[in-house]
Amino acid sequence: MSSFDKFLQNKILITTPKKELLIKLQLEHEEFYGLDSVKLANWVKGRSTPTLYKQLLIAQTCQCLPAYLDNFIEAKVSSSDERTFMKYINRIDSPYHQILASDNETYLFHQKGKYNELYPHVKPFSDKIVNLKKIAEKIRHRDIYAELLAIGTKDNKRSESFIWMLHGFDAYLDCMAHPGDKNEYSSQNCLAVTLTYYRSSEHFFLLCGIFANLMLERYPYKKKLVISFRGLEGLMLSEILGGQLIRSIPDSKYGNLYIHEFDVIRLFSNPLLLNIAKRYCHIYRDNFNRLISSPIKTSNLL
């Protein structure tokens, strides 16, 4: 459910007349080729509501995705998708997994920089997967821009949970001899989450909530988002999120990696992720700009 009509009335149409909005949507997105003034008027008056995907496209086109999240009311998730998602979450919260938990106070970090400078934070995890280690050795001297969202100790010498991001996936594809147009995966067009690890579901929701808001606020112009999912539960989750499999990386010990690509806006229009983005939008806005210079206690956020 969403009070999308109020969003159109109170945010979009304050600065953009209906006729101008209609033309802009038709010119920029093929999804709106069939949109006419009558259908748009029905959206504005609340007589009908576009899909979540089209809602996000409208918010993106008008550069007001944060305002859209403020207005958004959490959407219903199908029972089958909810079951698949909970299988993934339950794996994270397995008692066998929790034995790795630390009693130390944990902090949330966000770091940006060159790949070879930030990679040591995830190296202990990545190196355990032999094929990832080989790729890392091949690309460590390339000029790749990276970002790290992590939860760890105050000095950030030990990450307990993280999302590891690369701007561009073309270097990875070169290492895997993947055919096709590498420009689609350039730093300008693509962001890649090549490895994640979550010590608990609390960490998962916090990091994914921050990540979803980061993507929608700062990188909605990226054409592709590449994400690596590990294990059967990860593969099943990626499929219900609409991912297209690019490659799988076998690992019999730690679980196969399944690399999927997504359209950014279509991915985050999925109710599972859009609901998480909504729940964490205020935490993101209140704290994100401080994270680069000052880590924040997770106990103040969870």
What are these regions (language model features)?
Residues 84-138:
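Short amphipathic alpha-helix that is part of the acyltransferase structural core
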